[in-house]
Amino acid sequence: MRSAARRGRAAPAARDSLPVLLFLCLLLKTCEPKTANAFKPNILLIMADDLGTGDLGCYGNNTLRTPNIDQLAEEGVRLTQHLAAAPLCTPSRAAFLTGRHSFRSGMDASNGYRALQWNAGSGGLPENETTFARILQQHGYATGLIGKWHQGVNCASRGDHCHHPLNHGFDYFYGMPFTLTNDCDPGRPPEVDAALRAQLWGYTQFLALGILTLAAGQTCGFFSVSARAVTGMAGVGCLFFISWYSSFGFVRRWNCILMRNHDVTEQPMVLEKTASLMLKEAVSYIERHKHGPFLLFLSLLHVHIPLVTTSAFLGKSQHGLYGDNVEEMDWLIGKVLNAIEDNGLKNSTFTYFTSDHGGHLEARDGHSQLGGWNGIYKGGKGMGGWEGGIRVPGIFHWPGVLPAGRVIGEPTSLMDVFPTVVQLVGGEVPQDRVIDGHSLVPLLQGAEARSAHEFLFHYCGQHLHAARWHQKDSGSVWKVHYTTPQFHPEGAGACYGRGVCPCSGEGVTHHRPPLLFDLSRDPSEARPLTPDSEPLYHAVIARVGAAVSEHRQTLSPVPQQFSMSNILWKPWLQPCCGHFPFCSCHEDGDGTP
């Protein structure tokens, strides 16, 4: 619900004018405040997990209640063509943190694995990547991350924490080093490598049946087999079972953990109190750093399955458990925004809200939909080309600096947040690497009418599925699809029966010639254009093709973080509270803020 406190507060005129003066200084680069922390805006970045762009009232949903996010949009700038750089958690967040496509850091699929699978894998965001947190830290900011990380933990030994948030510019971390999955809820079916797990269990049963058959045959005298051979085969079967069950049999204990900085504080985590713990930590962080400046990246666990929702919100929405979780997320965000206002920081805080990618259409429990709604846009999570997989909310808020109620339809990217916040604090983006994002400051303020992106490239794993051309002279936004997933069943708009749609192989269609859409006239990508229906068809295909060729010249080989050797669970890398393998601990209290 909207807070009366948020509606009724008004800061003194002198304080209200301060952000405006700072903004003009940063924009025009005519002054550089060196010492006064008050001249640097606090940065609050809020990212939902798996939220569909059609799930919010401010984006057209009139059946889910999201008053706090809607108010943020009313008081700020709302982007309607805001795009994730990847359609899955790990690569999208890597791109967000670094302002670079995830494949540039090796943080995207080179095989069947498209996201990190274990806390105890050795893959993760490389140490030589620069996050916006590191740059802000160098400019005197306190930098905190609360919530989901999913960018890896260790490289070579338990505790080296080479991929840990504290090794990437954050000086405080509280949350999940991994991500929520169904495995975190004992009452849900398995999710992490569920198909492989079922296959390994089948092999184990086959081996056990063979060993029992040999033992029975030898005992009954049906055939002659030495006891040593039977014992040896039984040993092999046991070793095989232990080799996979030691990881897959304890997914909840290995992956579903909470950490504070370098220490595991809860293993496995108690889902029912997690939301309260995250809220308590966020409010506490704001209060501790209210004299600023601070960066707080609030990386929400909502609204990823298993949709852990407190009793206060269960059964309250019109859309089942998913809707309940969305409305709880909005309430939690409202509490955080209240903390900003209660500490007198509303007019000195740059706030941003988004989702890491589109809603998860395939997330179902029988006939119940457990994933988000992507509005008019085709596709969803896991689909790198279709709009539903990559179009996300984008809301920016800074009273007195950004115009209230402004709506921008220009193509923008999650990768743009990196150079945007770096510019706001007076920093510079790295000059020794490709940065794919562009600062949104001129666009948000109204100094520029057009996005700096002429072309945007949309990947599924390391496969280029589509490209977007924002034609400057006409204003048209053309979208070329080179590869699309094959929906199952045909025409369903998703790949039901599997976790997400594939990026390559037999489950995709390669289009020769490519599909072409004009998003400015057909944002739902319902009517592909042809040479007969669009006179510019061949010219557009050729121009986008040339841009793709130029883009590919910027690519260079890097170590693959999702390689099989990096993805595998390694017991010596497992974060552990206590003595491995007897890892167990719980936080005191219920997390009530």
Curated annotation (Swiss-Prot):
Its main location: other. The modification 3-oxoalanine (Cys) is found at C89. Residues 1-33 form the signal peptide. Its cofactor is Ca(2+). The gene is ARSD. The active site is at C89, H150. InterPro entries: Alkaline_phosphatase_core_sf (IPR017850), Sulfatase (IPR050738), Sulfatase_CS (IPR024607), Sulfatase_N (IPR000917). GO terms for molecular function: arylsulfatase activity; metal ion binding. Transmembrane segments: none annotated. The lineage of its organism: Eukaryota, Metazoa, Chordata, Craniata, Vertebrata. Glycans are attached at N61, N128, N347. It is found in: Lysosome. The conversion to 3-oxoalanine (also known as C-formylglycine, FGly), of a serine or cysteine residue in prokaryotes and of a cysteine residue in eukaryotes, is critical for catalytic activity. Belongs to the sulfatase family. Keywords: Calcium, Glycoprotein, Hydrolase, Lysosome, Metal-binding, Signal. GO terms for cellular component: endoplasmic reticulum lumen; lysosome. Expressed in the pancreas, kidney, liver, lung, placenta, brain and heart. This is Arylsulfatase D. It is an enzyme of class 3 (hydrolase). PROSITE patterns: SULFATASE_1, SULFATASE_2. It comes from Homo sapiens (Human). Substrate binds at K148, H304, K381. Ca(2+) binds at D49, D50, C89, D356, H357. Binds 1 Ca(2+) ion per subunit.
